[in-house]
A protein has these predicted regions:
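Fe(II)/2-oxoglutarate oxygenase catalytic core
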Residues: 1-123
Length: 123
């Protein structure tokens, strides 16, 4: 299902993960949490993003590999164009404040962060 909006493309895939996959991924996320970060050079206000992140794609997990393959297949996307799969954990009161994911062209980070494509999924 695609939500119609002139501002963003959001897709919903009902039952994309089964209950067992959800349980396994949730458990994996809790094993390697680190403070979530933002793309920024130097010091920044850490209250912008207060969640924790797990880089699931760095874990050697069959369930994560299967889900990654399913995502790439559904989008007809070669795996080399996808980002490392991540999972986020938010405790009560934690947040990722309103922001824009873009580089304006003058940003020194553009070279580093636009060499590889990326897709975000929120489960």
């Amino acid at each position: 299902m695609c939500y119609d909006s002139p501002l963003i493309e959001i897709y919903e895939v009902p039952s994309f993960l089964n209950e067992s996959e959800c349980d396994q991924i949730s458990a994996l996320i809790k094993t390697k949490l680190r403070p979530s970060t933002i793309v920024h050079e130097g010091d920044y206000d850490k209250s912008i993003r207060t969640s924790s992140t797990c880089d699931l794609g760095h874990l050697e997990s069959k369930v994560v590999s299967k889900v990654d393959e399913r995502i790439c297949s559904m989008l007809d996307l070669h795996k080399s164009y996808s980002e490392i799969t991540q999972g986020q954990q938010y405790e009560v009161g934690q947040e990722f404040k309103e922001h824009h994911d873009y580089f304006d062209g003058s940003d020194l980070l553009i070279e580093k962060h636009t060499k590889k494509y990326g897709t975000r999924f929120y489960i």
